[in-house]
Design a protein with these regions (language model features):
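Alpha-helix boundary/capping residues
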Residues: 68, 128, 147, 213-216, ...
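Glycine-rich, histidine-containing beta strand-loop boundary motifs that form or position
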Residues: 40
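Generic secondary-structure signature for well-ordered alpha-helical cores
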Residues: 30, 57-60, 67, 204, ...
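C-terminal beta-strand edge segments of enzyme domains
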Residues: 157-244
């Protein structure tokens, strides 16, 4: 994670989607027979983008997403923002699963996970690079709960600048099927150290839960939410460094 102040240096660090760097990961996914999500500084004009690409277990590229909510108050003011949120079907051992992605600061906005849910996402992948503490982890739990989606977050480990590990996965199933009460949606929370952590999403149970519970898109009233798409901002939310 490195965004130099010098634009020439920044562009020199960026790599294309179809270049040698990404080809190495594509071949690795194909060789190991696993899906791989890769984050990278993508070559783009006028400025590079913070991008994640998902390869399936055959090495086929199935999803590209560039971070929509760039941190314009920090060093990401030197990056281009992405245009939209995307989903894709991924072949897994449990059959086809619809995957969406959002990157780090995107999770601060409920709209990010919401639009992915509306586009059919069942599991949302969240590459992350910041301290994961109770408030940010609670955000992810809430995104899973309110959209009835799985959320899998991968954070840089302790030792990287401003990072502390604590990657998490939530399945979004907040209530037991037998009506006996609520349950903890957390599948796993990693420690601070780098490692391989396995999260087993009960996809059939998640789908059944979505068919019967009241969250997600079941009872929304989008006709009442017109102000959500207004571009007007008023105090106290005016920020001079906010880009369009």
């Amino acid at each position: 994670y490195n965004i130099p102040e010098d634009i020439t240096e920044l562009k020199a660090l960026a790599v294309p989607r179809d270049g040698e760097f990404m080809e190495a990961f594509r071949k690795t996914a194909q060789r190991l027979g696993i899906a791989v999500a890769v984050t990278y500084l993508e070559s783009f004009e006028p400025l590079p983008r913070n991008t994640v690409t998902l390869f399936d277990s055959t090495g086929r590229r199935v999803l590209d997403y560039s971070k929509v909510h760039t941190c314009d108050f920090g060093d990401e003011c030197r990056l281009s923002a992405g245009e939209e949120f995307s989903t894709a079907e991924l072949d897994t051992a449990s059959g086809k699963v619809t995957i969406g992605t959002m990157i780090c600061y995107d999770r601060e906005f409920p709209e990010s996970a919401r639009i992915l849910m509306l586009k059919g996402a069942e599991i949302i992948l969240v590459p992350n690079a910041c301290p994961m503490e109770i408030n940010r982890i609670s955000q992810l739990r809430a995104r899973a709960y309110e959209n009835m989606v799985g959320i899998a977050t991968v954070n840089y480990p302790y030792g990287k600048p401003d990072c502390n590990g604590h990657s998490t996965a939530f399945d979004g199933i907040a209530y037991r099927v037998d009506g006996s009460g609520s349950r903890n949606t957390l599948i796993i929370e990693a420690g601070e150290r780098e490692g391989i952590y396995l999260a087993d999403f009960p996809i059939d149970d998640m789908r059944e839960y979505r068919r019967r519970e009241v969250h997600g898109n079941a009872y929304r009233r989008p006709e009442k939410y017109g102000l959500l798409i207004s571009e007007e901002r008023m105090e106290p939310f005016i920020r001079p460094d906010r880009r369009k």
